[in-house]
Amino acid sequence: MKKYIVFLFLILTVILTICPIFAAETERRDSTANFPWAQQRSYYQTTGSFLTIGEEELERRTLGDLRNRLTGMMPAISVQEKAGDFWSSSYQSPNLNSSSFQVFLRGSGNQVCIVDDIYIPFGQVQLDPNQIESITVLTDILDKAKYGPMASDGALLIRTKKGGYNTPMQIHVDMEGGIGIADRIPEWVNGIEYARMNNAARAVSGYSQLYLPEALEGFSQKDPYDMKYPNVDYKSLMLKETLPLSRVGVNFNGGGDRVKYNFSFNGLYSGDIVKNSASNDYSKLNASASLTAKVGKYIEVSADFNTLLSFRRKGRTSWYNYRSVPAVAFPLTLGQSLGDDGARLNTPIYGVSRTFTQNYYALGLEGGFNTERNRTGMLNTSIDLDLSWLIKGLKSRTLLGLTQFVRTTIGKEEDYLGYYWTSQDGIGAISTHTGTKKSGKSILSSYTMQSLSFYERLSYDWAANGHKIAAGATFVMNDNTNKSNDNYQRQLYVTADISYAYTDKYIVEFVAQYAGSSRFNKDNRFAFFPSAGLAWVISKENFMRDIRWIDNLKLHTQVGLIGETDIFGAPYLYQSDYSAATNGMWLGANSKQDSWFGTNRYVTQYVTMNRLANPDLGWGKLFQADLGLDFDFLQAFSFSANFYYRQSTNRIVNISDQLPAIFGLRGSDLYKNYTKEHLQGADFSLNYARTLGDWYISAGVNASTWKIVSDRLTNDEYIYDYQKRTGTTVDSYWGLKCIGKYETHEQISSLPAYTSDLQIGDLIYADINNDGQIDTNDRIILSHTLPRMNYAINLGFGYKNFEIQIVGTGAAFFQTPMTNSYFWNGWGDGNYSAFVRDNIG
């Protein structure tokens, strides 16, 4: 294993802006933040972490994906970019993750995206910064409970721009362009290296060598078309190291006495590093429109529309196919068809072999193409009523939202003309690749998702003599369906919340939630979840007034329960499930000697139980406690610390592996509220910002730490206590403990063995249970694989309208297991990685 890997990357951005330079803080003590159901609360009305990001901070970063713009901005969010693409490979995923991005929010990877109070998978909307007014990060328990069960693991609450009343029209145009560089592509051996390593492997195994000296000499010519000794550099033929990037955005907003508006249009184009196939690129167009109008004195009506249209064009190969075939497997091409094999005259003939039956270079050129087209439409309409004529401070808000997502993949799945080849015989018979062509495109796959949301909220605000009360009740309904699930997924819940603040020093909040889900039996469909919060602004106390270097000191805490349910989880798990099938049985007269029951075939029908009923199935529950401290001092520094403990109980899992075989139910599922785990962690941040005339400087550092421990698991029964997973972290890495290498034959004969074919130089493993043999009972925890600390450094320098930002993020205190998968690249005659080449011995 690599010992305590620490990774760090830096992003340098230079921005020319037409707006003033703003401070780099993400927590503003003098501002308000948006909360669920169109609520706005000041810093002195909340008991949570108050993590909010404004449009200025987002627009200052020139990165094409919104998730990348969040990198390093606050300790609660950890963003890892795994690849440099922008298209969404997880359009169904309820969280922010994809194959290119891994996003954690206080240890959870299941946070959701909420746009204008409507949940939508992030991959289906992909908003740009000029469409966003603010992002509020919901991390503390009471803040999450305000929205409901879907936010149980945290959420990004995005509020889009609406324009402003009595505001002149403002037009903002921004453009980005650049080049993406693939800095790390796995390296694999060239043809000569492969031949030598293959010879060595065969010699060790007692086989004759395939590649004689004249073959090695031939491979050294590096000729991909050599009919005797080909050596193909697939990486240079199929990949490039750069790709173009460009983005343009236009936003204009404003308003008059009765109407306000906001319109945004954005386009993004990204190339690809795959070059030997049909067009490989990604294009995205999105637009948003918001129109709000006052109708009379007490009514405000608004309509918001967001749409996304994206195209992902690609061939039938992926970037990693360059390593799938050894460089010496066959020549790239073998000539041209004479027309006697069913192909057109002069059709290129590509080489394949009996061992490696796919020529990925040819597949990229002639294997066809496909275009993934995504279309998203979000339409929200709302009516706000000012009921102060009835009760002063009373308001009503009604919203209806409809979301439609359609993904269609259209293309051609064609084939190239391939012949088998060997170095001894040259061109052989035609392969299974016969050069099939299609006359037109066809639909290769499709996916649809629909969501209907509705909520009604009554709110009441009152303030007098230093007392402030904000209260509300919200009724929410969500209805979701998608192509992969024929059943509707429905949630219905009611939340009641109240906040009380006295002289901006003492704040109390309560949230009560009564939630229901269609996933459960009617007797267990609804559950009650309460939350509470307290905050004390110590700096406003009289005894603190003489300490002038302290600008703000606030202690806050929240504690409560929230329901856990997967909105797209399998429904009706509380019911039994059966499947019917037919089978043939041989009975009757016996006309063959090898037939036991006869040779007349009779069709019989039978029913199999796939799932056992559990009518007691119900909500999983999440208990969470949060404690935080905010400390601003010297009118330049801002410090925050947040500690949290979260325990998940009664998660729904399949416990069929715990049923004794004597029950006769093997192969049948049984779901139960069973597993339990807890998470504990902390976030810290320290920021500095100062403006000196036309100069501006900012600096910040933040860090977070967390770990998740399993408290109850299924099938956790072992002979030895040290093998139990209960009580260990979820990222624990289990394996045999290596204590050295065999150096003598005496060691081989005397020490516990794990195979009968031990050789000098093989690894020695510890016999943990002292039973004289090495087996699975000797597996112990060797390390953990998730970082124990994520951190970020932010630096900013500005002069008038010129600004430089430096953002660095990293992770520390974890280990990467060097498993057999690293060393077994090239098993048999397969290709070898450079890692294997460099670590032989």
What are these regions (language model features)?
Residues 1-27, 70, 532, 701:
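Bacterial Sec-dependent N-terminal signal peptides
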Residues 601-610, 647-676, 707-785, 803-841:
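Surface-exposed, extracytoplasmic segments of Gram-negative outer-membrane nutrient-acquisition systems
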Residues 114, 471-479, 507-516, 764-786, ...:
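Catalytic-site beta-strand/loop segments enriched in glycine and acidic/polar residues
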